[in-house]
Amino acid sequence: MVLSLLSVMLLSGYKFLSKKEELVTILPLPQVENKFKPQKIWSYYIGSNNGGGDFYSNLQPTVQNTRVFVANRYGLVKALDADSGKELWAKDLSIYTGCFSRNRPAQLSGGVTAVGNRIYVASELAKVYAMEAKCGSLAWEVLVAGETLSPPVVSDGVILIHTSNGMLQALNEADGALKWTVNLEAKMLNIRGGSTPTTACGTAIVGSDNGLVSAVMLNIGQIIWQQRISQTGGVTEIARINDVQATPVVVNGYVYALAYNGNLAALDLFSGKLMWSREIGSFTNMLVENGIIYLVDQNDRVIAVDAKNGITSWYQSALLHRNLTSPVLNKDSIVIGDSGGYLHWINIDDGRLVAQKKIASALLVTPLFDGDKIIVQATNGEVHAIIR
C-alpha cells in the first residue's frame, strides 16, 4: 500500500501543513509463527474517539488498583473493572447547549491520569477536569493556556499541563488554581501534539517543538537548563519539523530524549550537558529497561539501543510505515500496536517477531499493562483486555 507521509501522520491524530507530500510504502503484514497464543478476555465499547468530527484524539487509558479508566473525545469518562471489563461508573463531560440541542463534544484528548483518589483529563478546548476516582463526580475544572493534547502529570502536589501553544503550566492539585506558567516557545509549524513532561528530583523535564529539552523547577517554575537535540533543516515543511514529542525518560541521572527529524540524546539530569547522541528521529515514546532503550523511529523501524553509549543492539524492519505505537514491556517481549489493529510481540534480546494478534480497528495509542493483562483502546472506541 502506498500513502503519503502526510496521510500517515494524520492517522496518528497529528495535523501537518505541507505543500509537497512524500510517498511511503506500507509493508504488508509479516508472517509470524506465534510462540504463544494471545487471547482476549473482555471487550468494552466506550465510543469513537473522533467525537463526531474529523479529528481523532489519542486518548490512552490508565489503570489504578483494580480499575481501568477510559475516555473518548466526545466527553465520556468511565471506570471499568480490570478483571471483567464491567462498567463501574460513567461521567459525561460533553457541553450542554440547551434542552432542544445535542451536547457539544468536550474534545477530551491526551489520556486519563489517575493519582491518589482522583483522575485527571484535559481537552482541546483548554480545559482540565479533576474527578473522584471512586464515583466519577467532578471535583473541579479550570481553563488553561491552550489546547492540551498530552495527559496531565501529577507530582509534588502540582498538575503539569503542556499546551500545544508551548506553555507549561502547574496547577494546584487540590483545586486547580494556577501556580506558574513557563513559555517554551512554540513554532508556527509543528506536529499537532505535545511532549508529556516527566519529573525527577523536584524538576519537570519536557520537550518542545523547537528541538529543545528543558528542565523546570517544580516549586517556582524557573527554567534550570535547556539543551537543543534537534536543528531545523531540510527543504520541505515536514523536513524542517524538529519537535521533541516523545516523553523524556530519566534513569540513573540521565535524561533520554528523542526528536522528530532529530536525535536520540542522553543528557545529564542536573546540568543538561549532552553525553551522547544518535541520528534517530521519532515522535513516539521510548522504553528504557535494564540498560537498553527500545524505540520506534519515524519510519516505524523498531530499534534497541545501549543506554550507555547509543550503540544499536538490534533493529526490526518488518513493520515499516505501519504507524506503530510506542513500545511497552511484557515479560521477555516488547509489545507494539499498529494502524491495522494488530498487536506485535518482539523478543527483547534479538528483535525477532514472536507473536501477533488482530485486536480491533486501528491501534494508535500505547498499550497499557495491568499485571498479566494488556489493555488497548482502538480508534473505533473498543477497549480490549488481552493475556498471553
Swiss-Prot record:
Biological process according to GO: Gram-negative-bacterium-type cell outer membrane assembly; protein insertion into membrane
Pfam families named among the record's database cross-references: PQQ_2 (PF13360)
Keywords, ordered alphabetically: Cell outer membrane, Membrane, Signal
Signal sequence region: 1-17
InterPro entries, alphabetized: BamB (IPR017687), PQQ_b-propeller_rpt (IPR018391), PQQ_rpt_dom (IPR002372), Quinoprotein_ADH-like_sf (IPR011047), WD40/YVTN_repeat-like_dom_sf (IPR015943)
GO cellular component: cell outer membrane
Record localization: Cell outer membrane
Top-level taxonomic group: Bacteria
Main location: membrane
Family, per entry: Belongs to the BamB family.
HAMAP family for this protein: OM_assembly_BamB (MF_00923)
Subunit structure: Part of the Bam complex, which is composed of the outer membrane protein BamA, and four lipoproteins BamB, BamC, BamD and BamE.
Protein purpose: Part of the outer membrane protein assembly complex, which is involved in assembly and insertion of beta-barrel proteins into the outer membrane.
Name under which the protein is recorded: Outer membrane protein assembly factor BamB
Organism the protein comes from: Moranella endobia (strain PCIT)
